[in-house]
């Protein structure tokens, strides 16, 4: 069974993953580059990563390091929790130190496995490692203080994933049992086409652009963006994406409108109160809600739809 895990990424999800896996008894190394050294210093100074909201406790990873060689050495699984625009950077950073038998899991996938594979081939990496993408993220969360992350919905070790190539999926998921309990997607495309952020983030952010500019750090998509007109637009986008999914011979995994409906009806859905209250953002239009969700899932959905002969307008 996998015991030694490296979590790459010192953002909110990286903090959550490192604390969560430490809580469950794994030997966790938390890694990012020197730009994030102050965050590791905060964790050391404060005695660990504090989880608040829908997770609780303070947990100290076994190792905090900005050294990629130290981070990768002897890791059985490497979970990559960074935005898609950092995938190439991370691939180049860890490539020289990879060892046979390691499993690299990209969360969320966003077709990052293709980037990692391309970099490894370019650099002539011969280590026998696997590349796997999880559909969606570990949990919604935000850094709310030094070494503190507020989790908006319960952290869940379940989900869907696929490897690149897909023929590796079965053995990877078997190796990761006890760490995560993923069920297999057909391939990495099934994961990215089903990403909920494509429908919920892009249209609502664009339609709320003026309010984002006005409120800045005080803006919350879930408090201010889901107006009737925005919800109508998101519904249309969901239907267009459904058509692409079906044309690909796949099924929609979840109704992305469910979360919006819960947020708009808080009295009937107290389970999303923490999510609603603390998951702020975007604070500007230069934000992952646009450049990541448009550039990954959105662009893929449009491209796939066009190749399949559909008239994709979203």
Residue ranges with predicted function:
Residues 230, 236-278:
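Small-residue-rich helix-loop
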Residues 84-145:
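Rossmann-like NAD(P)(H) cofactor-binding subdomain of soluble oxidoreductases
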Residues 54-63, 125-131:
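A short helix-to-beta-strand connector/capping loop
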Residues 262-314:
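Long, low-complexity C-terminal extensions of enzymes
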Residues 57-98, 105:
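Rossmann-like NAD(P)-binding element
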Residues 1-53, 72:
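NAD(P)+-binding Rossmann beta1-loop-alpha1 motif at the extreme N-terminus of oxidoreductases
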Residues 2-3, 129, 157-159:
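Nucleotide donor/acceptor-binding cores
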Residues 138-233, 237:
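Substrate/ligand-engaging "lid" and interaction regions
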